Amino acid sequence: MKVTLLNKEEVKNFYKTWGLFACKCYNTNPKFAEKVGKSCHKTRHYSGSRSFYFNFLIEDVPRSAMDQLARHEQGVVKNIQSQRYTDSSNLDWYVPKVIKKHPDLLEAWTNGFESDSADYQYIIEQLKKLEGFTGEKAREVARGRVGMDIYSSATFGFTIEALEHLMHKRLCYRSQEAIRELAKLIKEEIVDVLPELSTYLVPECLAVGYCNENKMQCKELKDSVIPTKEQFDIIKNSKEYKDMVLQLKKKKLA
């Protein structure tokens, strides 16, 4: 699995670009553009950021994870490797960590994908012989024989809102292994260029302070100080919570 940020130089100037777009709202001097961009992000005023995309080359990702990534729509552009226009006969496949732990399971997994690959090539050969199908015409039929975890590649672009949403959902411990691993790689690529974004690209529970999964909250956080949404709704209506918030506001005003 490999992720490459394609527009690193543009990402370095992300906040300035955002600010230049947003400065018009208050007729702010463009020399303050970077400061404006950061302020807009902190206050979640995203309209000026939506012309900017973080663009990635994503390689050797299981097709199952690619399908999950493609479900993200708002603020996302994508171009995914076609199994009709490209040959899948020599592609490798993803192996989950739990499968790697057990030799018998690994053997069954490997044998299955090797069989898929052999059947794929056989179907293409026979379709040419029996029907005269070649190239994409044969592959559009044979692709149904490849496994869901065969590797695929794509290019994706995300606005900052879309990236944050992606991380909220896919860095969650309840997300599947492969898509969570992919989300981590995407975050690493961005943070390597613009470290300030690290605190925004987090699981949803860390962003909002509670877990929307409620009874299905992950075992990693069940005993943590992060409440479920149902628990938080009770907490926020308590006298203790309201008193604490008012005290904090008074301290800030003092």
Where are these regions (language model features)?
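Family-specific signature for flavin-dependent thymidylate synthase
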Residues: 1-254
